[in-house]
């Protein structure tokens, strides 16, 4: 169940988010929301996105995470305001070893989004990133299983 998985992974980041002064707002339908996905892979994808949010989101802001069903698809969206403007394209940001923070003052290798994209593809899902100034949005979509 995608709702339960999302809730569990996000729950593991609550303390870290509070430490970084982030308010996480999750909007999801009542379970079950079923998709065909490998549990370990999906956990890793959500974990990578949440780790990036905790590292790169502007302190004192809200992070919006939504799960919705639309036309036979299940769509997970992660939105946050970045600490600094992202002067990079979404395609470049998903390349291996590329990081969005030019100052490189945070831990990490620049592999998280590339891994998330690869794992999502292995599960027959779609992974997309949208960047608009300092607004970062990651969108995962999978076919809903009935």
What do these predicted regions represent?
Residues 1-14:
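A conserved beta-strand-to-alpha-helix junction within the catalytic ATP-binding
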Residues 18, 23-33:
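Conserved catalytic submotifs in the C-terminal HATPase_c
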Residues 53-54:
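Short helix-loop "hinge" at the ATP-lid/N-box region of the Bergerat-fold HATPase_c
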Residues 60-72:
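Short beta-strand/loop element within the Bergerat-fold HATPase_c
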Residues 85-98:
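Short conserved segment of the HATPase_c
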Residues 93, 112, 116:
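Short alpha-helical Gxxx[C/S/T] motif in the catalytic ATP-binding
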Residues 124-132:
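Glycine-rich ATP-binding loops of the HATPase_c
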């Amino acid at each position: 169940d995608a709702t339960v998985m999302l809730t569990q992974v996000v729950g593991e980041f609550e303390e870290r988010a509070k430490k970084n002064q982030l308010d996480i707002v999750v909007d999801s339908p009542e379970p079950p929301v079923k998709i065909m996905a490998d549990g370990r892979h999906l956990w890793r994808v959500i974990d990578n996105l949440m780790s990036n949010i905790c590292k790169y989101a502007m302190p004192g802001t809200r992070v919006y995470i939504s799960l919705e069903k639309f036309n036979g698809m299940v769509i997970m969206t992660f939105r946050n305001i970045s600490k600094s403007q992202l002067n990079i394209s979404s395609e470049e940001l998903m390349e291996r070893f590329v990081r969005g923070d030019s100052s490189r003052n945070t831990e990490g290798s620049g592999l998280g989004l590339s891994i998330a994209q690869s794992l999502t593809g292995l599960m027959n899902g779609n992974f997309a990133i949208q960047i608009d100034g300092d607004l970062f949005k990651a969108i995962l979509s999978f076919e809903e299983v009935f």
